[in-house]
Amino acid sequence: DMLQNGTVISGTYIEKPHSFSTACNIATQIIAQVASNQYGGQSISLTHLAPFVDVSRKKIAAEVEAEMEGLDVSAERKREIVERRLRSEINRGVQTIQYQVVTLMTTNGQAPFITVFMYLGEARNAQEKADLAIIIEETIRQRYQGVKNEAGVWITPAFPKLIYVLEEDNIRPGTPYYYLTELAAKCTAKRMVPDYISEKKMLELKVDKNGEGHCYTCMGCRSFLTPYVDPETGKPKYYGRFNQGVVTINLVDVALSSGGNFEKFWKIF
C-alpha cells in the first residue's frame, strides 16, 4: 500500500516510485522505519516490487526509442537492449535491499529483522509473474554470492531471511519455474537460505472463516498470523497487520489486580 499509494517518512511525502530501483530504495527506508517502531520481525513480499519492473521497462523503452531515433535498428534489437538494461536495474535494486538492510541501524541499534517472501502465486497476471521470477532469481543469485566482510571474504549475511514457496509451477522438473527451485536448493546448500513453504500444506492448514485456504509469509522468521477476514471488506488480510512480537503475561499479577472478579480478570487479560 505504501509503495503503490505513497507514504510519509520523517515528515516528507514519498510518492509512488517511478522505477524499480527507486521502489527498492523506498522499501528499505520503510523497513528501517517499521523496525524502529516495533518489537519482533517483519516481512515483505517481492510481489509488491514486481509491478515496478514493468514501470522501469516502459521507461527504459522510451529512452531507447529516443536514442535510436533515425537509426536503422530493428524492433527485436531494441527489445534486447531494453531487457539488458532492465536486468541491470533489477540487479542494482536487489543489491540495494541486501546492502541497505545489513548496514542500516534501527533505533534499537541493530539491523532490521526482516524476511523476504518469494511466492510466484501472488502475481496477478502472467507478465507480473514473469517479472517476479526475474526478481526472485536475482535475489537468490546475490544471496548465493553473499556479502564481503571487513577482511574481504564472502560471507552469509544474517538478513534479510529468505522464504521460497514450493507450488505447482516450480516443484517438478518440466514446470515453468523449476529452474528457480534448483537455484534455491543450490543456495540453501551453501548459505542455509532460503527456507521453504509448501503452498499445498498452507492452503490446507491456514483456512479462514470463509472456508478459503491461504498461503502467506510469517512475521519475521517463524511466527505465522492466524487467518483473519476484514469485517469491512469481507476479504482476508495478512499484510499490514502489526507485529507486537512475543508478549509475556503475568497471570498472578492479573489475578491479584482483578480482586477475585472473573469479568475484571478477563478484561485485564
Please report, for each region that a protein language model flagged, where it lies by residue.
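Conserved catalytic cores of very large enzyme subunits
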Residues: D1-F269
